[in-house]
Amino acid sequence: MRTLWIMAVLLLGVEGNLLQFRKMIKKMTGKEPILSYATYGCNCGMAGVGQPVDGTDRCCFVHNCCYEKVTSCSPKWDQYIYSWENGNIVCGEKNPCKKQICECDKAAAMCFRDNVKTYKKRNIFYPKSSCTEPTDTC
C-alpha cells in the first residue's frame, strides 16, 4: 500500500510522459492506472522481473522492453505530442525519440485494452517473491 501511495504522490506532480501514459490507459480501459496496474503481476510498476503472470502482465513486459530500446531521451519523463482520432491514439511527435516513447505507450495502452479479459484483481499487489522464473529476453 505504501508503494501505491508513493506512486500516486509522485504522479500528482508529473506533467511528462507518465501522466500522458496514465491518460491513454484510462481512456482505453476505463481503469484507473495507478490503482489497477502500478503493482500488477511481475512486470507492471517500478521493477519488472520474472515471467508474466497473464496477458495483462505481458503488456507491461513488452512496454518495459520498448522503453529499454529508447536510448536518446528519457521515456518516463519526456513529454510528447499525441491526439485522439475516432477513439485511436495518434502519435504526432516530430522528434523521433519522443515519437518512439509515444508509440511504446500507445502499444501498451492498446495491449491493456485487448487483454482486459485476462485482468484479475488477485494480481494487484502480486508478491514479487513469487516472480522467480527467469525473465524472457526482450
Curated annotation (Swiss-Prot):
CC per GO annotation: extracellular region
Gene Ontology molecular function: calcium ion binding; calcium-dependent phospholipase A2 activity; phospholipid binding; toxin activity
Subcellular location: Secreted
Keyword annotations: Disulfide bond, Myotoxin, Secreted, Signal, Toxin
Pfam families membership: Phospholip_A2_1
InterPro entries membership: PLipase_A2, PLipase_A2_Asp_AS, PLipase_A2_dom, PLipase_A2_dom_sf, PLipase_A2_His_AS
Membrane-crossing residue ranges in chain numbering: none
GO biological process: arachidonate secretion; lipid catabolic process; negative regulation of T cell proliferation; phospholipid metabolic process
Signal peptide from the UniProt entry: 1-16
Record-linked PROSITE patterns: PA2_ASP, PA2_HIS
Gene3D superfamilies for this protein: Phospholipase A2 domain (1.20.90.10)
Disulfide bonding pattern of the chain: C42-C131, C44-C60, C59-C111, C65-C138, C66-C104, C73-C97, C91-C102
Summary of the tissues where the protein is detected: Expressed by the venom gland.
tRNA processing as UniProt keyword: no
Family affiliation: Belongs to the phospholipase A2 family. Group II subfamily. N49 sub-subfamily.
Misc. remarks from the entry: Negative results: does not possess enzymatic, hemolytic and hemorrhagic activities. Fails to induce platelet aggregation by itself, and does not inhibit ADP-induced platelet aggregation.
Assembly information from the UniProt record: Homodimer; non-covalently linked.
Role this protein plays: Snake venom phospholipase A2 (PLA2) that exhibits potent myotoxic activity causing inflammatory cell infiltration, severe myoedema, myonecrosis and myolysis in the gastrocnemius muscles of BALB/c mice.
Name of this chain's protein: Basic phospholipase A2 homolog TM-N49
